[in-house]
Every structure is written in structure tokens, then in C-alpha cells.
């Protein structure tokens, strides 16, 4: 195979992997147990010091997402008609998959803890879970920033996040605490929520408003993931090598999604998110031949193996080319359409992807 042919094949494999990584588990088209999550803080414990939010309870973590989406819908008209167009939907959808796949449970071997056990304590989120730790930065941080900017109402109460004493050093518990420990991530979430009203009420076209809002959102999400990558890394020692490899691929894919300003509404999220493994991977698991996982799950894991190997081989040049090609709102719109064709149209010539990206990048 020629070098160009190899690169074209690699590009197709990598980008397919990127958008097949975040499987969505839904109930009636909405995130798992969405209807059970309270819609405002008045349903949570209130003390003299403020509202106590327990992010280690699945329902309360989902409450933060519900409040975020409900509060930002008014600023998302540029995304399209209907409340399912809000691009924040991908966050609670992914949380539902993490719950169902056992990735929010206590990962320690021979543990007496029942946290996350489907039989004993299914809605418990373990502070030792890697995915729960990463999701903390994609739920607690944006929620606190939304309250601080006034986008989400706290009913006049201070919002305090409960953190178990044994892991208190690993998690922040208030807006000021999070801003001190993670200033870059909090600043980008603050900017996102602070800019929503201004962008949505501007005289700009809906096309440009949409691109601006998505750009701000993905910049905040990517910064949160980068922050979480360092903060949660010790927890990866509790998992098998295949699971850690999968975790890293899941993290690294954010660069592709972010650069394209992907509009992650409910429909698009479900359409672009192919099946992820339905359980935590064990040391003996070797995709694509894991007997108790589906063909689709094995395929996704196999592609992730390719992604890691080829990214190392190319030294990150595919990510750089992708970012270079996504140089304008129009280019990013083309990029999303390109991903749609690549992934959802079996007749699409994936081998042409590299040349398409090269042409797009030179026209910037």
C-alpha cells in the first residue's frame, strides 16, 4: 500500500473511531432515569450553609444536567426548533451509559463496597471510579459556573458539593474552591454561560450564533477533560490494561469532536454514537474476539486499538490536519457533513477522506 493510501485508510479508521465511542443508553429517547431526577434545587437537602448537592448519587448528578439544559434552552433557538436541540444533551446521555455499563461503580478488587452494584446500590456513584471522576469535571464544574453567572437559579442559596472525606483532596466543593483548583476549566465554563445571552440576542445569523455557542461549549468541555485527565489518572491503576486503553481513547477523541463544533443534540448523539462496551473490560479481553460482547462492541474496541497505534505512528498529524481543516464556520459545517457521510453511508469512499481534509485545509 502506498503512503498516501495508508494515510487515507488510517484517517477513515480514526475518525470512525472518534464518533463511535460514546454509546447512548436511553429510556424513551431520554437519558436513563431522566424522569426521576429532580428539576430544581428545592428538592435537595438545604441547611443553614446552603443547598447540599450529592454528586455521588446518580439522580442528583443527573439533576445538575437537567437544570443546565432547562436553563439554557432559552438561549439555544439557533440550534433549531424544539428542546431536544440543546447541545448539552450529550452529557447526561453519556452518564446514562456509564451507569448501565458499570463504569460508575467501585472498581477496587475484592472490595466490600456495594457502591454501583446493580443488585445492592445501583444509583451509587463511586468516588474511586475513573469515569465518575472524569464526569465530575463535566457536571459539577459547569453547574457551579452556571449558578455563578445566574443562568441557573440557586433560589438564593449557596451551592455546596458533598465530597467524601477520604477523597476530599481530589475534588472541589464550591465555585470558589473549583476556581482556585481548576482556574482554566472554570474560566471557560464561566465564559460559555456568560456569553450565552449575548450571543443568542445578537443581530448575527443563526448559523453564526450556533457556531459561536458550540465553539464556546466545546472549548469548555475539552478543557474539563484535559483537567480531568491529570486529576483522575491515579484511578486508572484500579483497572485492566484493555479498560485503560479504552479510557485513553475516549479522552483523546475530544479533540476531533471539539474542532468540528459537533452539534450534539439528542438525535445526532444517538445517530453518531455507536455501541460502547456494555461492561468494564477485563485483563483477558482481546477485541474483536470478546465472546460476551456484541459484534458492534467488539468492532468499536478494535477500532480504538487502531486509533491508539496509528496516532502514535503519525505523531498526531491527523489531529493537526483535522483542526487545520476546521478553520471557519462553513468548514466546520462541511466537517460535520463529512463525518455523517463517512460513518452513516456505507458507500462513502473513506479512502478519499485524507485528500478531502487536505483540500479543505488549503482553502482556509
From Swiss-Prot:
Pfam families: Leg1. Keywords: Developmental protein, Glycoprotein, Secreted, Signal. Residues 1-22 form the signal peptide. Detected in all tissues tested, with the highest levels in serum (at protein level). At mRNA level, only expressed in liver. Disruption phenotype: Morpholino knockdown of the protein causes a small liver phenotype. Morpholino which can simultaneously block the translation of leg1a and leg1b, causes a more severe small liver phenotype with hypoplastic exocrine pancreas and intestinal tube as well. GO terms for cellular component: extracellular space. It is found in: Secreted. GO terms for biological process: digestive system development; embryonic liver development; liver development. Glycans are attached at residue 70. Belongs to the LEG1 family. Important for early development of liver, exocrine pancreas and intestine, probably through cell cycle regulation. In liver, its function is partially redundant with leg1b function. This is Protein leg1a. It comes from Danio rerio (Zebrafish).
Amino acid at each position: 500500500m502506498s503512503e498516501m493510501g495508508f494515510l487515507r485508510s488510517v484517517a477513515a479508521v480514526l475518525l470512525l473511531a472518534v464518533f463511535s465511542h460514546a454509546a447512548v443508553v436511553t429510556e424513551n429517547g431520554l437519558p436513563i432515569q431522566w424522569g426521576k431526577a429532580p428539576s430544581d434545587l428545592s428538592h435537595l437537602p438545604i441547611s443553614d450553609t446552603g443547598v447540599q448537592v450529592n454528586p455521588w448519587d446518580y439522580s442528583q448528578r443527573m439533576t445538575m444536567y437537567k437544570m443546565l439544559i432547562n436553563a439554557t434552552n432559552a438561549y439555544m433557538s439557533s440550534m433549531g426548533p424544539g428542546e431536544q436541540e440543546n447541545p448539552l444533551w450529550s452529557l447526561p446521555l453519556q452518564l446514562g451509559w456509564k451507569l448501565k455499563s458499570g463504569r460508575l461503580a467501585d472498581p477496587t478488587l475484592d472490595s466490600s463496597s456495594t457502591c454501583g452494584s446493580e443488585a445492592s446500590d445501583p444509583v451509587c456513584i463511586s468516588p474511586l471510579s475513573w469515569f465518575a471522576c472524569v464526569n465530575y469535571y463535566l457536571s459539577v464544574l459547569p453547574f457551579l459556573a452556571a449558578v455563578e453567572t445566574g443562568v441557573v437559579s440557586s433560589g438564593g442559596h449557596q451551592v455546596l458539593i458533598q465530597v467524601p472525606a477520604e477523597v476530599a483532596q481530589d475534588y472541589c466543593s464550591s465555585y470558589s474552591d473549583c476556581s482556585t483548583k481548576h482556574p482554566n476549566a472554570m474560566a471557560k465554563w464561566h465564559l460559555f454561560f456568560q456569553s450565552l445571552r449575548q450571543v443568542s440576542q445578537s443581530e448575527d445569523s443563526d448559523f453564526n450564533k450556533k457556531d459561536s455557542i458550540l465553539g464556546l461549549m466545546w472549548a469548555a468541555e475539552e478543557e474539563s477533560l484535559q483537567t480531568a485527565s491529570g486529576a483522575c489518572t491515579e484511578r486508572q491503576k484500579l483497572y485492566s490494561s484493555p479498560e485503560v486503553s479504552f479510557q485513553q481513547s475516549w479522552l483523546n477523541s475530544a479533540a476531533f469532536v471539539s474542532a468540528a463544533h459537533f452539534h450534539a443534540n439528542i438525535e445526532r448523539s444517538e445517530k453518531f454514537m455507536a455501541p460502547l462496551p456494555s461492561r468494564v473490560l477485563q485483563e483477558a479481553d482481546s477485541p474483536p474476539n470478546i465472546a460476551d460482547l456484541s459484534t458492534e462492541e467488539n468492532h468499536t474496541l478494535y477500532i480504538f486499538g487502531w486509533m491508539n497505534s496509528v496516532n502514535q505512528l503519525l505523531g498526531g498529524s491527523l489531529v493537526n490536519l483535522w483542526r487545520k481543516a476546521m478553520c471557519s464556520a462553513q468548514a466546520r459545517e462541511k466537517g460535520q457533513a463529512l463525518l455523517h457521510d463517512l460513518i452513516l453511508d456505507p458507500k462513502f469512499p473513506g479512502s478519499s477522506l485524507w485528500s478531502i481534509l487536505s483540500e479543505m485545509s488549503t482553502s482556509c
